[in-house]
């Protein structure tokens, strides 16, 4: 065992011991002993030395269910804190820096060696356009209150690592840890009520306030340092390689709770939050910048003030206060904005820039490059609107709205027209100067909501909004329809209208749709920037399995790159990835480097899912590491793109995809018992009842195809079968080996980043899958006639593991990554009891109707949250 593993185990042991003390104080020694017995039984079960755990949990009294679930949930959260702390800070002086810290300096050296000049490198880095789009997520059940306590626990782990602590100081740290853990234990960790979209948006703002606000300027300092050491050039002040957008409060696809009024409220809350955060910065800077010497340009603004910097910052502070007050008042109803209210980001940036330039001009660069520079970087990155809010709606809602309008106008039903007639009508109306809608038109509620959303977009400042994303887009008319609805609402500025291609068929059709759109007269002239296209990962994987979906996504991107190049239009690909492999998730750095050549081009946009936001961006140090990885990967994919795949690789990938989709659909669609087995063996039915997010877990009606991708993945993840992430690969790879293509598979894995990344992610998810746990759910929950199907699926899981081991030449999955393996093993100690307890709770819940606020249902929700926390990339 390495020293780093030992220290992690020591931290986990300490935190667990302190939690045990807290539990003993509330529930007594006998209850704590029961927890210990369950933990030891879980270890024995995993070693195959006994099967006591299920019977122990089955004997639990009703009143013990919730505290037992809470105990193991808290153990897992504390283990996660220790692990995250280790990933950021733990390194002996003789050990190399972690990869995340080295990745950019090493890349810049490689780029220079490959012939890229200093000026070109600096120019490309400064021009990078990386947009991370924060999305709400039903499985992110951790409350903001607890997240803040967990951050404080991480800070105390850092404090106890100081080597010069005297015993009394070390004891103080331990007492603070004990108090924080007690506070966390006595705080209810789950919501009793479903969060609203506004709650979700506030959660996203809290991540910015508590982590990204600090992480972004720290990250940019390191980027600037790496660039200067490599090229002698600095990162320009106006450069913001990574910016943030959000779907929280803008994503109304399938969520009737996200209304035009909600979107307006979230936009105002973002402005309030931005003003409040910058006020804190300005208060600090005004206290610091007491200097008297100033440049002529600054003096022109403030006259002969004895404290010119403070005088200028006071003007900005007054305007920020006015902005905050206006945003707060506007939440109650529309308010006129005075001239003092800040609307243009330049009005925020310019005073800070003037102070910065003046300090440098007066020989005080060391002061300029301190907290002032950090505030300036924040102003450029976050601005007055904090994040750009995307709007997302289903294409069918726009078609229905236009059908009602054309029907009212006596033109027939838009939905009944063919594509050519739709395009002809839309193009004519887009050029028409008269309104399409008469003033007295009274639409039905759903159409009225679509039109109200468009009016909110037209009324909002351009810099507060990102893209209008059309889910389930399938034709060029879907894009023009939104453009027309926005025009009718009074939008006169350009806004990116983005088709989202999601299913396997839609991905295959993405090229022809964009070819048609870009070929329409006048369309390209109205772009005002790159053509953005969104690639959906979740629904395509649910539709066809990850083997076929991954290849369809790759081919769709290749086609889009080619078509945009032919039309001389720049392309921005927006990747709709989930947190899990089954929804396109996985390590971002490897995923970006595995994109088709030419598909990145200095621009990259991706969703960051709720439960992964906390793990990737919840602590400033972790956030910095992930920002480094994104920036380095996009720069490398832009300047050192991978070569196109060899014809033989493409041919084999075609075959793998065909075999994979056939095997996947053979189980998921063609087996008449599959849906019933899924509903019995996983908590899928219960997930819809639990208060896990503002969006319903199901679309309106139907079977598996009606399920949203998140509960589909989430149900399988909770039982550790992880089926959506691997089903289909076992057959596809086995068939290739049977055809004698082992050498070709090895070559693809060695030389083709796309294929290597797929296999690496498959291996990672197989290492987290657990047939023993999945079987325990079956034994407790599934009717005897369906048990053979469960056994068959576990056989397929075993086959997947064996074929991946054969492909990688290892004896154990993840043998090449012992640290990851250690993290998984460490968490299994606490996960195993939660899984077994969840199966017991599901069995009890299904045998009777339990109220949502009953201890049984509350305990079930805690197990869902705990397993999600333990497995990280959950749903």
Swiss-Prot record:
Record carries keyword Magnesium: yes
Cofactor(s) needed by this chain: Mg(2+)
Disulfide bonds: none
Keyword terms of this UniProt record: Carbon dioxide fixation, Lyase, Magnesium
The reaction(s) this protein catalyses: oxaloacetate + phosphate = phosphoenolpyruvate + hydrogencarbonate
InterPro entries in alphabetical order: PEP_COase (IPR021135), PEP_COase_bac/pln-type (IPR022805), PEP_COase_Lys_AS (IPR018129), PEPCASE_His_AS (IPR033129), Pyrv/PenolPyrv_kinase-like_dom (IPR015813)
Protein name: Phosphoenolpyruvate carboxylase
Function according to Swiss-Prot or TrEMBL: Forms oxaloacetate, a four-carbon dicarboxylic acid source for the tricarboxylic acid cycle.
Source species of the chain: Pseudomonas entomophila (strain L48)
Pfam families associated with the record: PEPcase
Family: Belongs to the PEPCase type 1 family.
EC number: 4.1.1.31
